[in-house]
């Protein structure tokens, strides 16, 4: 399936991105913990010098607070890293139309979109670059392939080019129904899964 291929490609890119920034995350974590430990030691040393009878209790309290603050910082840093990785994946998504496999993915996205709509005459909306990539003969081939499956006449026509990264938007002729299979929409629909996978790769 076209959308599945895109999701798989996104997760592959996530894996590559994760390996690059995971070491940075570890360095940041070590720095936070070390700073917290030094801060706690300095404060408790001052207390011990003053002969505070409750030094041990105070020391433990400061250390507990330091660990809590460290954990909060780590959680915030983790979220920042996940967001950074996702933004990197969004940038990588813009490069997908340049790949050799893109035309095959695009054709599958068109087929998925057509199959999801109950209509005989449908409009295929592409960006300007893909308007040239997908020739009329390719749409005719899709018509024939799907007609044999659904046992009804299907007419596909190109619509006006859209401002999308890639992929397609399939609409009924009257415009009342549509399936948005643009690359960015496929990405957003799979965001929950992408975030979960990025998190598992990073941590």
UniProtKB/Swiss-Prot annotation:
One GO CC term on file: proton-transporting two-sector ATPase complex, catalytic domain
Listed InterPro entries: ATP_synth_B-like_membr_sf (IPR028987), ATPase_E_C (IPR038495), ATPase_V1_Esu (IPR002842)
Compartment(s) where it occurs, according to its Swiss-Prot or TrEMBL record: Cell membrane
Molecular-function GO terms, alphabetical: ATP binding; proton-transporting ATP synthase activity, rotational mechanism; proton-transporting ATPase activity, rotational mechanism
Keywords linked to the UniProt accession: ATP synthesis, Cell membrane, Hydrogen ion transport, Ion transport, Membrane, Transport
Membrane topology designation: Peripheral membrane protein
Predominant place of localization: membrane
SUPFAM superfamilies cross-referenced by the UniProt entry: F1F0 ATP synthase subunit B, membrane domain, V-type ATPase subunit E-like
Gene3D superfamilies linked to this entry: ATP synthase, E subunit, C-terminal (3.30.2320.30), F1F0 ATP synthase subunit B, membrane domain (1.20.5.620)
Quaternary structure and interacting proteins, as annotated: Has multiple subunits with at least A(3), B(3), C, D, E, F, H, I and proteolipid K(x).
Protein's job: Component of the A-type ATP synthase that produces ATP from ADP in the presence of a proton gradient across the membrane.
Family: Belongs to the V-ATPase E subunit family.
Protein name from the UniProt record: A-type ATP synthase subunit E
Organism lineage: Archaea, Methanobacteriati, Methanobacteriota, Methanomada group, Methanococci
């Amino acid at each position: 399936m076209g959308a599945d291929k895109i999701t798989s490609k996104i997760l592959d890119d996530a894996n590559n991105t994760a390996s690059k920034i995971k070491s940075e995350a570890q360095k940041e974590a070590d720095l936070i913990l070390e700073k917290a430990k030094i801060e706690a030691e300095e404060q408790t040393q001052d207390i011990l010098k003053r002969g505070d009878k409750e030094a041990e209790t105070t020391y433990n309290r400061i250390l507990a607070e330091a660990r809590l603050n460290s954990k909060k910082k780590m959680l915030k840093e983790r979220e920042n890293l996940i967001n950074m990785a996702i933004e990197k994946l969004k940038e990588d998504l813009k490069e997908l139309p340049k790949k050799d496999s893109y035309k095959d993915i695009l054709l599958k996205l068109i087929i998925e979109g057509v199959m999801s709509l109950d209509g005989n005459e449908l409009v295929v909306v592409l960006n300007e670059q893909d308007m040239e990539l997908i020739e009329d003969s390719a749409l005719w081939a899709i018509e024939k392939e799907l007609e044999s499956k659904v046992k009804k006449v299907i007419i596909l026509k190109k619509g006006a080019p859209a401002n999308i990264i890639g992929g397609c938007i399939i609409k009924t002729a009257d415009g009342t129904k549509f399936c948005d299979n643009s690359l960015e929409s496929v990405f957003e629909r799979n965001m929950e899964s992408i975030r979960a996978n990025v998190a598992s790769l990073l941590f």
